[in-house]
Amino acid sequence: MTKTRQQQQEKQQESSSVSDYQYQLNIRVYYEDTDVAGIVYNANFLRFFERARSEWLRELGINQADILDTGVGFVVRRVEMDNLLPAKFNELLSVHCKIRQMRRASMIFDQYITNGDGKTICTGLFTIACVDLAKMKPVQFPANISEVLKVAN
C-alpha cells in the first residue's frame, strides 16, 4: 500500500467514529486463526468480516437459510482489503460494518477491524451481489430484505 493510500485510510478512520458504523461484532482470536508465530493468517480477516455481516443480517431478522430456500443468495463479487497491523493469538477484536451503498442487485459494505487498543488493524470494502442461484445471474433483492436494509442503513 502506498503511503498516500495509508494516510487517506487513517484520516478516514479518524473521521469515522464507531457510532458511524451500524454494527459491531467482537471476535476472539483462536489458535486456529493464527500461523505458527501466533499472528492471524491474513485470509482469516475475510472470515471475520463475513461473520460480522452475517450476524448483523441475523440481528436484523434476515435468515439467510430461508433466503437460500427461495433460490436466491448473496455472493461476494469484489473485495478490497488492507492489512495495517498484525492481530495476535487470544486478542479480542472488534469488527465494524456499515452499508456504504445499496443498489438494486448489490450492496457495498464498508468494514474495519480494531484491536483492544482501538487501533485499526484491517479495512475492507465488499461488494455483495444478490443472485439467482440456479442461473448465477444478478437479481433484485427481495423487497422485504431491501426494506430492512434501507431502514438499517
Regions found by a protein language model. Give the residues of each.
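A structural signal for beta-strand boundary/capping segments at domain termini and interdomain linkers
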Residues: T120-I121, P138
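Generic short beta-strand
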Residues: Y31, Q111-Y112, I128
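Hot-dog-fold acyl-thioester-processing enzymes
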Residues: T2-R77, D132-N153
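A short, structured loop/turn motif at beta-sheet edges
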Residues: S16-V18, N115-K119
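Conserved GNAT-family N-acetyltransferase fold
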Residues: F49, Q111, G124
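A generic structural motif
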Residues: L84, T114-G116, V131
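Hydrophobic beta-strand-centered segment that forms part of the acyl-chain substrate-binding groove
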Residues: W56-I108, I121-T123, I128
